[in-house]
Amino acid sequence: MKNIALIITFLLFCISISAQKPNYTKKTFLVSGNCEMCKKKIEKAAKSVDGIKSARWNVVNGNMKVKFDTNKTTSDAIQSAIAAVGYDTENYRAKDEVYENLHYCCKYERTIKKE
């Protein structure tokens, strides 16, 4: 009986630890792009990052609004994922070879200098 009580206590403790409440934050940053095709690819790249709750890119002004769990990811990780599919962000420049493979209508004016 004592062992059963001990096991139940241990299991409840484990459940409470694993049920950590998400710590969501919202961030806005710029992403270069031109069209609705860009929008789909940019949002898909952002949503592929573990911990993303929402991602919306505005075609007109280039603002990317994300909501994410700070226990699982960072704004830099999200921007890096977007740059990996060919789109420059505030902090990351897409690799030239990836940018060059974008559809012709998705090739935006690159403002971030090479490092």
Name the predicted role of every residue range.
Residues 1-24:
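Bacterial Sec-dependent N-terminal signal peptides
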Residues 13, 29-32, 99-100:
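Processing junctions and N-termini across compartments
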Residues 26-56, 60-63:
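N-terminal targeting signals for Sec/Tat export/insertion, comprising classic cleavable signal peptides
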Residues 42-45, 77-86:
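Short amphipathic alpha-helices in soluble, non-transmembrane regions
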Residues 59-67, 97-103:
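Surface-exposed aromatic
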Residues 69-73:
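Helix N-cap motif at beta-to-alpha junctions
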Residues 86-98:
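Conserved short beta-strand edge segments in small beta-sheet-based binding/regulatory domains
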Residues 100-115:
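Short, low-order "capping/linker" segments at domain edges
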